[in-house]
């Protein structure tokens, strides 16, 4: 048990991604149509979706820039680090 706890703590620190960003995209239960962004852990990019306006989860950002900042996504336009 202690081994698993240590493993997950090390894995979390080594990947350095906000846990909210790993949540699945959730449109929520209501029927509004708010354009939002979520972090897609498969593509490792922030992608657009339509949010229903209530419930959902924390992987829900008003702008793509906010999503990229919180989830650590580098913009394709930013220079690469050496």
From Swiss-Prot:
Pfam families: Kunitz_BPTI. It comes from the Eukaryota. Residues 21-71 form the BPTI/Kunitz inhibitor domain. The keyword Disulfide bond applies. InterPro entries: Kunitz_BPTI, Kunitz_BPTI_sf, Prtase_inh_Kunz-CS, TFPI/VKTCI-like. Transmembrane segments: none annotated. The record marks 31-32 as: Reactive bond for trypsin. Its main location: secreted. Residues 1-16 form the signal peptide. SMART domains: KU (SM00131). Dual-function toxin that inhibits both the serine protease trypsin and voltage-gated potassium channels Kv1.2/KCNA2. Belongs to the venom Kunitz-type family. Sea anemone type 2 potassium channel toxin subfamily. This is U-actitoxin-Avd3k.
């Amino acid at each position: 048990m202690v081994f698993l706890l240590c493993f997950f703590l090390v894995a979390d620190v080594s990947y350095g991604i906000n846990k909210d960003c790993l949540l699945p995209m959730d449109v929520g239960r209501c029927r509004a149509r708010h354009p939002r962004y979520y972090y897609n852990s498969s593509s490792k990019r922030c992608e657009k979706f339509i949010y229903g306006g209530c419930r959902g989860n924390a992987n829900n950002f008003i702008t793509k820039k906010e999503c990229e900042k919180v989830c650590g996504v580098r913009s394709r336009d930013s220079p690469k680090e050496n």
